Amino acid sequence: MREMNLLVTSSLGVLLHLVVLCQADDDSELLVNTKSGKVMRTRIPVLSSHISAFLGIPFAEPPVGNMRFRRPEPKKPWSGVWNASTYPNNCQQYVDEQFPGFPGSEMWNPNREMSEDCLYLNIWVPSPRPKSATVMLWIYGGGFYSGSSTLDVYNGKYLAYTEEVVLVSLSYRVGAFGFLALHGSQEAPGNMGLLDQRMALQWVHDNIQFFGGDPKTVTLFGESAGRASVGMHILSPGSRDLFRRAILQSGSPNCPWASVSVAEGRRRAVELRRNLNCNLNSDEDLIQCLREKKPQELIDVEWNVLPFDSIFRFSFVPVIDGEFFPTSLESMLNAGNFKKTQILLGVNKDEGSFFLLYGAPGFSKDSESKISREDFMSGVKLSVPHANDLGLDAVTLQYTDWMDDNNGIKNRDGLDDIVGDHNVICPLMHFVNKYTKFGNGTYLYFFNHRASNLVWPEWMGVIHGYEIEFVFGLPLVKELNYTAEEEALSRRIMHYWATFAKTGNPNEPHSQESKWPLFTTKEQKFIDLNTEPIKVHQRLRVQMCVFWNQFLPKLLNATACDGELSSSGTSSSKGIIFYVLFSILYLIFY
C-alpha cells in the first residue's frame, strides 16, 4: 500500500512538473520584445488546437490631422506593453450598401470601427513558437477604395496552423486618404497607400524574427488591388529587398484600372476640390481645405471624379510618379527592371460578373440577367470607356455570336468575358509573359470551382475574389457547410501556397502526384484549380488576349486622330471596312 501511495505521489509530482513547464513555455510566448516595444499576444482556438495571435500592432504614426494625405511616418517606440489582443480600426472607406444585409456583399464591408488611425498589422504564429519559420504577408484588395485586414475571410489562423508559417496581414489607406495625388507636393504626393504597405514590410523585415519568422523568407500575396500592390512592389526599387517571393491572385500591376498618370491624378484631385467647394489658389489651399473636411464628406463624392461612366474603374489609385515607379510600368517590364524571383499567379473563371452587377444595365442578383442586345451594347461602352467607336465595334465583333446575337444568356456571358478579359486575365497574361523572360520560375493557375455554399446567383459563376476563402482555409470550418471535396481543395491550395513560399516551387519534391509545371513563354502551361485531379493546359485565353494586348491597342492608335471613323452615320460603314482591312493586315504581318 505504501509503495502504491509513493507511486501515486511520484506520478502527481511529475504531472505537476509538466504543468509548470508547459505554463512556463506558455508564459514565454505571452510577450514579444520588438524594436518598437513589448507586445502581448492573445491565444486563439484553431480547429482542435490553439495558435498565438498578435492583433493590431502599430507600424506607423496615425495619419491624422495634418498627416492626412502625407507619406507615413514610422511608429515611435512605446514604453510598457502593447496589448495586441483585439483587431484594429478599419481605414476610412466607401461602404457597399447596394444589397443591405446580403452576406455576399456584407462580407467585404468593414467589420470594425472606421478611423484614419488605422495603420496596424496582425500576426498569427504557430504554437509552440517556431525558430525560423517562413513568413507569408497578405495585402487585401478592394479597388484601392475599400478593404480591411480584419475581415473574417482573411483570418490567418487556419493557414498559419495547418502549414506552420508565420502569417501577417497589414492595413493601408485607401481612397483619397491613400491615393490623392498632387505631383510635386510633399503634402499629398500620391501613392501614400503603397508607402503604408512598404512601411509595414519594413517593420516585418526588422521585427518578424522576434515572432519566430525568418525575415529572409517573406512571401507577399494579395488579391485584386492587393495583388496589383504585390506586383507594384516587385517593380518598385524601394520595395524589392523587403521580400523574397510573390503570389498574385486575379491580376497584375499593369491592369488598366490600377494606375493613372500624374496629370490624371492631379485632375481628379482638382475635381474632388470642386465637388467640395474648396479654393484652388494653390495646392496648399486645396489640401488644407480637404483636411478640414470630415472623412465621410470625401468618401461621399469620390466617385464623381472619374472622367467617364465606366465599369471596373476606381477614383483614387496609384500614380506613375517617377519615384515609387521610376518609369512607366510597361517600360520597366520591357527592360526587366523589377525584382527577379519566383512568382505564382492566376485568375478566376468569371472575373467580370461581380462588376457587371454593380454597373451595367440589365444585370440583377435576383434573376438570370438575360441581356438584351441594346443592354449588351451599352455594357460594351461602359466596359471599354477609353475606346472610340471603331474600337467598340471591334470589341462587339469579337465577343458576339453572330449566329445567335439576340440570345440573352450569350450576351450576358459575353459581357462577363469582356470585363474579365480586359481588366484581369489579359493584363495578367501580358505581365506573366514579360516577367517570365527575366524571372526565376513562374507558376500559373486557373481557378474554376464555384463553392457549393456561394450565395451569389448561378449566372455569376466563379466570381472575382472567391478563391480567397480556399486560400485561407475556411472550408476546414464544419459550421460553414462546405463539402468534403472543398475541404480537400482548400488544404491542397494552402499547401501549394505555403510550399511555394518555402521553396519557390508549389510541388512537393518527392510527391507521386501530378506536377504543377513551370510556365514558359514558349509552352505557357497552367493548371486548373478545382476539386478534380490536376489537369495541365496551355495558352490561357490566348485568342482573346492577343485581341486585347496587341490588336485593339494598335487599332485605337491607328484611328486616334481620324475623327470620321469615330462619328456616326455613313462613317459607321467606313469604320467596319477599315476594321476588316486592318484585321487582314494584322493577321498577315503579326
UniProtKB/Swiss-Prot annotation:
Found in the synapses and to a lower extent in extrajunctional areas of muscle and nerve, and on erythrocyte membranes. Its EC number is 3.1.1.7. Keywords: Cell membrane, Disulfide bond, Glycoprotein, GPI-anchor, Hydrolase, Lipoprotein, Membrane, Neurotransmitter degradation, Serine esterase, Signal, Synapse. InterPro entries: AB_hydrolase_fold (IPR029058), AChE-related_enzymes (IPR050654), Acylcholinesterase_fish/snake (IPR000908), CarbesteraseB (IPR002018), Carboxylesterase_B_AS (IPR019826), Carboxylesterase_B_CS (IPR019819), Cholinesterase (IPR000997). GO terms for biological process: acetylcholine catabolic process in synaptic cleft; choline metabolic process. Glycans are attached at N83, N440, N481, N557. Residues 568-590 form a propeptide. It catalyses: acetylcholine + H2O = choline + acetate + H(+). GO terms for cellular component: extracellular space; plasma membrane; side of membrane; synapse; synaptic cleft. Pfam families: COesterase (PF00135). Belongs to the type-B carboxylesterase/lipase family. PANTHER family: ACETYLCHOLINESTERASE. Isoform H form is a homodimer; the asymmetric form is a disulfide-bonded oligomer composed of a collagenic subunit (Q) and a variable number of T catalytic subunits. This is Acetylcholinesterase. The lineage of its organism: Eukaryota, Metazoa, Chordata, Craniata, Vertebrata. The gene is ache.
